Design a protein with these regions (language model features):
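Double-stranded beta-helix
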Residues: 2-13, 106-136
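Structural motif
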Residues: 75-77, 84, 100, 109
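Short strand-coil-strand connectors
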Residues: 38, 79-83, 106
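Short, surface-exposed loop/helix-turn segments at secondary-structure junctions
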Residues: 54-60
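A short, N-terminal "cap"/entry segment at the start of jelly-roll beta-barrel domains
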Residues: 1-53, 132-136
Length: 136
């Protein structure tokens, strides 16, 4: 983030651009890129229909990111290490890097914010993100 210009920015998730992402069915909104965040990863996923994949199944073995998911709208069904549970709006779900996780929308408009970084390390953008975002 630059030292010049405003010290804060704001936007509604619906105002953020969506980019193509073959990993999920929901709209991918690269929050980190929209705000120029360089200390942690941040992405939003907005489902258009019930059952859409909002968080792809994955484990953070390579980048070792701890991840926090925040359900901003609707309700998501998470499956983490084989345990399934519903997460209504306002739910926070924290995953250690070793957790095998995925989530689907239980209703249209379900919106999940994902925030992540590796503990104790300088943040590096995940390879999956750099492969899917336009060059700066």
């Amino acid at each position: 983030m630059s030292e010049s210009g405003p010290a804060y920015r704001r936007a509604h998730v619906t105002e953020l651009d969506s980019l193509p992402n073959e990993l999920v069915e929901a709209e991918w909104k690269p929050v980190r890129g929209a705000f120029g965040i360089d200390a942690f990863g941040a992405n939003a996923y907005v489902a258009g229909a019930t059952g859409e994949l909002v968080i792809q199944r994955h484990v953070e073995r390579k980048v070792a990111h701890q991840e926090l998911y925040v359900v901003l709208a609707g309700e998501a069904r998470f499956t983490i290490d084989g345990e399934q549970f519903d997460a209504p709006v306002g739910t926070l779900v924290f995953c250690e890097p070793r957790a095998d996780r995925t989530a689907h929308a239980n209703e249209p408009g379900t919106t999940v914010l994902a925030i992540g970084a590796a503990a104790g390390k300088q943040f590096e953008v995940s390879p999956w993100e750099t492969q899917r975002t336009p060059a700066a």
